[in-house]
């Protein structure tokens, strides 16, 4: 696959699977410092909100930037912040899929690395990488279709 991409007003020819995280390492293309950063809403702390009188609380999801995962919490119905999603899929699409790939850490006892898929926000593709089996973040999937349907721009939940 060949793509012509413009970055900082410079055309870049992309052949096959292009890994921008490796290509930009150590480069001084000034406009790209925030490249791969999570949106501000994903970095906000959990705020469960305030009670709405006699209405029962509901279960929602927030992105935990420390663990790198979407986690469930009890929302009381009023207030809070934008790190508050009705379902895990919206949380993943808004935050989890925007994390850079993370191969994890070696397990104890050690195990062989396995092939997983991660969503690359630059190319908008699901690519393979080696995962050690322990740790990492939520931007890793066992199957390509899980990656694409959760994170890809071709499908909305």
From Swiss-Prot:
Tissues in which the protein is found: Nacreous layer of shell (at protein level).
Keyword field contains Repeat: yes
Residue stretches making up the BPTI/Kunitz inhibitor domain: 42-95, 97-151
Locations listed in the record: Secreted
InterPro entries from the UniProt entry: Kunitz_BPTI, Kunitz_BPTI_sf, Prtase_inh_Kunz-CS, TFPI/VKTCI-like
Gene3D superfamilies membership: Pancreatic trypsin inhibitor Kunitz domain
GO CC, alphabetical: extracellular space
Gene Ontology molecular functions: serine-type endopeptidase inhibitor activity
Keywords: Disulfide bond, Protease inhibitor, Repeat, Secreted, Serine protease inhibitor, Signal
First and last residue of the signal peptide: 1-16
Keyword 4Fe-4S assigned: no
UniProt name for this protein: BPTI/Kunitz domain-containing protein 3
């Amino acid at each position: 696959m060949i793509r012509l991409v413009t970055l900082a007003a410079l055309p870049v020819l992309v052949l096959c699977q292009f890994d921008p995280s490796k290509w930009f390492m150590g480069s001084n293309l000034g406009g790209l410092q925030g490249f791969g950063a999570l949106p501000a809403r994903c970095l906000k702390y959990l705020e469960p909100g305030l009670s709405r009188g006699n209405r029962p609380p509901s279960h929602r999801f927030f992105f935990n930037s420390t663990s790198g995962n979407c986690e469930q919490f009890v929302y009381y119905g009023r207030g809070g912040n934008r790190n508050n999603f009705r379902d895990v899929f919206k949380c993943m699409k808004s935050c989890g899929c925007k994390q850079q790939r993370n191969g994890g850490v070696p397990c104890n006892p050690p195990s062989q690395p396995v092939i997983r898929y991660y969503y690359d926000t630059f190319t908008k593709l699901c690519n393979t990488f080696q995962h050690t089996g322990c740790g990492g973040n939520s931007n890793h999937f066992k199957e390509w279709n899980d990656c694409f349907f959760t994170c890809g721009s071709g499908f909305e939940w």
